[in-house]
Amino acid sequence: RQRQMCIRDRLKPDAVESLRQLNNSAHRCVMITGDNALTAIHIAEEVEIVAREALIFDKGAVGEELVWRRTDDSIVRMQDPDAPLHRHLFDEYDVCVTGAALRVIEERPEALRELVGNTVVYARVSPNQKELVLSVLRSLGYIALMAGDGTNDVGALKMANIGVALLDGSEEDLQRIQEHARLERLKKVYESQLSLMSRWGQPPPPVPPVLRDA
């Protein structure tokens, strides 16, 4: 006999009103998460980031093909990864992009910019993809504030104009953030050394072990 258990992580009482105030004051609110698309869309609907029918832009089952599908898995349109995006869909739906689809579109800068400019939810994205989304938003002229509550958000927090870290204050989280910042500083120093050696026609210095093993 099969058994099921349902667990719900309730929203904070002021979450909906806070997001509503941001949306009503000419701010654009976007969700970027590692959760799956259906979970992300459900939460985004609760906080009114998604107001229309949601459409998921995802990688198909074969090769590099992409699909535009509803939450019930019905296909709205197929998308040739090398063809222009179906722009009319942005006018009809609130779009959720998966990390798998983002990996395909990353190779096409103009399509990526158009997609990021019209997407309200990102699901199943990696830490590097979170950082990429923030980078593209800034290139589109947005002043970006990123709020994140885990070490997976550190890169995106640093990429944003304003990064708000929502931590539980545990020593482990703080140590990870400090270590990430230290590695970033070492990386910049090493890149400066590479540039200097190249300018003087000298061989590159060895990669510091701490960077090589990172």
Show the residue positions of the predicted features.
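Conserved Lys-Pro-Asp/Glu-containing loop-to-beta segment of HAD-superfamily phosphomonoesterases
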Residues: 133-150
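Cytosolic catalytic headpieces and adjacent flexible linkers of membrane translocases
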Residues: 1-4, 8-136, 154, 158-214
